[in-house]
């Protein structure tokens, strides 16, 4: 176990992991409008470990060619000293080396060294000078570092063996689009968190994935993120380009300012107007912008009321009471076409109405109005009148006629059924034997009642009215009752 543990300690000492021994508080980053970003890291490590650290961050070991690239790297170095406080010179790994098959060339600016990437850059003659001339060789592989005097001012290139340790390294990242830095306005405590695992207090340009957090007035936190879409890059959840709106009217260098601080040394106006304001005629004051401002009288917007449905009640509408209206008169309601329509008085639920019927004359001119949905609405100008009789609409008339017809048909059917019942009763043969059995045995039957009975039957058979035959039968029965049975006078 002890040999293995000692071997692990030796391996960590000779081959530290990527990012080991770094100082995040001293690291810095910057981006240019071309889409290139650079980061400076303070960490003691070898050349290969520096390359791996840049790859893990999403970039590569940086080149420092002439032109904009050189200026961006110099700006990072001059932004502040490293962890040592600027007491000594610092060495930073870059992507500059000389391969085994290449020789040292004293007459060339890079002395036979070359950049690992083939990206086009500036002229090699515009590069930095060499602090020390490299050794002449055509067989050994050599690396180069960027030496910074006091950790701030770049001195130039220096040859260094690749297995030795430097004080830091430079990484480069390339993006297609970048977000311009948002103006802070009234924001404070700004913090940029770049996608290559680096925090910064300010970035002129931010790659997609950068998150900016700050505090607005009242210690309200705000956070926005740079995102890329089909159009380009923009800040998500940010309306405009100011993080926190200013309470005043002036902005200077993207921050809120007062009017006395807007004048430069020469007396010129050095501020810009905040959102909602525009520069006045004097060229120094910001006045309220007229765009989007309401008028003094206000704008009357008609309110749409939803149509009444089976599940929603009819919206109530209250009309203002006019002084010139008399009690009992019908109020007048203005329509959309500036015409006046009278509304009849409707008694409320549970109240006693003095009007037995509502008499209205339908002397109206129907006006067809086509709504946007395609339906036709008819309008009637109706007036109330007490002299004209009440009129029924078509539906009420149809119902009345139908009910009357049904009653008449029912009466006719009832009369017919009663007549048939009576007719069947008189034609029944059971009445003849009952009359013959009324006389005592041994007596002869009276011919006159028989004649009367025959005449009654004859009356029925001859089609005489049932009512007349009935009266005649009753008269004959009365005569039979007055005469005694078995009398000779009968």
From Swiss-Prot:
Bias type Low complexity, positions: 301-315
Matches recorded under Gene3D superfamilies: Laminin (2.10.25.10), Mannose-Binding Protein A, subunit A (3.10.100.10)
Record keywords: Disulfide bond, EGF-like domain, Glycoprotein, Lectin, Membrane, Signal, Transmembrane, Transmembrane helix
Statement: the UniProt record of this protein carries the keyword rRNA-binding: no
Topological region Cytoplasmic: 419-490
Chain ranges of the C-type lectin domain: 33-173
Gene Ontology cellular-component annotations: collagen-containing extracellular matrix; external side of plasma membrane
Major localization listed first in the record, in broad terms: membrane
Membrane topology of the entry: Single-pass type I membrane protein
Coiled-coil residue spans: none
Localisation: Membrane
CDD domains documented for this protein: CLECT_thrombomodulin_like
Matches recorded under InterPro entries: C-type_lectin-like (IPR001304), C-type_lectin-like/link_sf (IPR016186), C-type_lectin_domain (IPR051505), CTDL_fold (IPR016187)
A GO term for molecular function: extracellular matrix protein binding
A single BP term in Gene Ontology: cell migration
Annotated glycan sites: 189, 381
Domain EGF-like: 245-287
Signal peptide interval: 1-21
Protein name as catalogued: C-type lectin domain family 14 member A
Phylogenetic lineage: Eukaryota, Metazoa, Chordata, Craniata, Vertebrata
Gene: CLEC14A
